[in-house]
């Protein structure tokens, strides 16, 4: 997702961070996945400061203005975040679906879309 601006990368990480926290349980595997994405975005180690400073509504606004292709890639990242800990949580799925609805991403979470989940 090299087409993303710096602010868009922070917005994506904000939404992923919200998903991580939706079940009130933060697992190491979720943090590791988030850090892996941040590394792929080539962000500095202190990226979480900016993520935490960004309001979720601002993040949604940024994401909603992206192309359909980029939005679908972001939906895939969100889905991966939901399944990464092998625990499909209702609040995480609800947040996924709400983000997709707000940002006009034509998807609903479906575990069958994630072949790595067992």
Language model segments and positions:
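Small-residue-enriched hydrophobic alpha-helices in membranes
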Residues: 1-118
């Amino acid at each position: 997702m090299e087409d993303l601006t710096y602010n868009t990368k922070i917005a994506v990480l904000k939404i992923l961070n919200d998903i991580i926290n939706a079940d009130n349980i933060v697992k190491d595997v979720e943090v590791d996945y988030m850090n892996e994405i941040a590394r792929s975005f080539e962000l500095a180690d202190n990226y979480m400061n900016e993520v935490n400073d960004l309001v979720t509504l601002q993040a949604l606004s940024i994401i909603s203005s992206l192309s359909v292709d980029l939005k679908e890639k972001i939906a895939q990242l969100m889905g991966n975040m939901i399944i990464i800990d092998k625990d499909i949580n209702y609040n995480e799925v609800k947040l996924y679906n709400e983000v997709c609805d707000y940002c006009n991403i034509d998807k609903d979470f479906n575990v069958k879309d994630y072949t790595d989940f067992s």
